[in-house]
A protein has these predicted regions:
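Internal, conserved structured core segments that host functional sites
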Residues: 67-151
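N-terminal active-site beta-alpha-beta segment that forms phosphate/nucleotide-binding
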Residues: 16-71
Length: 151
């Protein structure tokens, strides 16, 4: 079965996603099926279409497998994330902002992207008071587990 962006938009709306919300997505691209017409961009574009210009889309951009004690180098633009192809495709898109945390950064685009990602590097833990995770809570955001569990 070929999955189109239009079908994904319909499914997201049927799931209860809405225009203007703040949404953090954990994902497994393979859970969407054998073939998505348009690939990663179609899925990301479907999210952006549903959330609209007043929404904010976030993906974790964890790099704990790349930034290690043996190689303690982190680059906002260059360090890849290690948790999937969809978050990595999102990270590389124009206009996406990445929080400044060497191992647990978050990428965001949309109305609140800057507010959610700023000052993450000032925390002593990945989920401190300046973290995108805390700000997600403060802005009433939700987390979508797209084809993946809690492990």
């Amino acid at each position: 079965m070929i999955l189109t962006k239009e079908a994904i938009v319909r499914d997201f709306l049927n799931m209860g996603l809405w225009r203007g919300e703040v949404l953090l997505v954990h994902s497994s691209m393979s859970s969407l099926g054998f073939f998505v017409e348009g690939g990663y961009d179609a899925v990301i574009d479907a999210f952006l279409e549903v959330l609209g210009d007043t929404g904010t889309l976030l993906f974790p951009a964890l790099s704990y497998a790349t930034v290690t004690r043996e190689f303690p180098v982190f680059s906002l633009k260059g360090t890849p994330c290690c948790i999937g192809k969809l978050p990595e495709a999102f990270r590389k898109r124009p206009g996406v902002i990445r929080s400044l945390h060497p191992t647990h950064s978050v990428c965001a685009v949309g109305r609140l992207a800057k507010e959610i990602t700023m000052n993450h590097g000032m925390d002593t833990t990945p989920v401190g008071p300046n973290s995108p995770f805390r700000r997600l809570y403060e802005f009433g955001g939700r987390i979508l587990m797209l084809g993946c569990g809690l492990r």
